[in-house]
Each structure stands twice: as C-alpha cells, then as structure tokens.
Amino acid sequence: MEMTNAQRLILSNQYKMMTMLDPTNAERYRRLQTIIERGYGLQMRELDREFGELKEETCRTIIDIMEMYHALHVSWTNLKDAQTIDERRVTFLGFDAATEARYLGYVRFMVNVEGRYTHFDAGTHGFNAQTPMWEKYQRMLNVWHSCPRQYHLSSNEINQIINA
C-alpha cells in the first residue's frame, strides 16, 4: 500500500484514537500505528487485506450463488419425492476461509449486516466451507441458468445442478 507521509500521519492518528476508544483492541491498534509510522513495507501489506476490494461483478456473482441455493432449497422443499435428495446437498456451505476469505467475508456481510438470506444455516463455522468452492459454484450456476424454471426445479434438475 502506497501512502504519502501526510496520509500515514492521518492514519497513525486514527489508530491512536482507536486505542483510546476501543481498549479491548488497543494492542492491535498500537501495532498498526507503529507499522504505519515507521513505514514497514512488509507489514503494511496487511492493510491491503484489511482494505481489500471486491468488484461489483464478483459481489453480484456471490449474490447469484446465494440466490441459486435459495431456489434449490425452495424447489427441494416443494418436491413430492424430496427424500431422494439429501437436504445437505441443497444447503449453502459458503466459501473457504483460507483461500476465499474475501468471498466468505461478503457472504457474512450479506447475512449478518444486510439481513439477506438469514434463513441460511451458517453452521458452526460461519459459512466457512473449509474447501475451495468458487469453481464448483460457477459450474452449478451455468447449469442453473440453463433451467427454464429456476425456482421450480425438478428432482432431475436439482441433481444436475448439485452434481455439476
């Protein structure tokens, strides 16, 4: 992260104020203040992660994935032979915290802050699928988008989507 000396001074002062306002996280803010004041390049890269960016297209794709899982679950609930498909297969798992943290953070934001998809079960790991899911979800979306009635899926269509 490139910053001018003036920007570093402003951010350093912000961390100093946060130390006073939030004593429970004071040590963390003091550490960040030191990194900013001294310009430690390697550690300043941590700020890049904190101030990351998720493009609009990516956000829309994540919402589309969540909407697909909503449609899968609604369709599964309406099936007469729902027992043939395990409910866990139509339950949104989330994203891998280790490799897809930005996506996971957006899912948590959508559910916990925006109040969308609150009916999704976060499980004990808070939507951490613990395995990379992005590519799997992309394949599933391709199949889902090709279905003529995306919210009234047949058993066969549900199986095609979850097995993509």
Swiss-Prot record:
Belongs to the UPF0304 family. It comes from the Bacteria. Disulfide bonds: none annotated. This is UPF0304 protein CKO_00501.
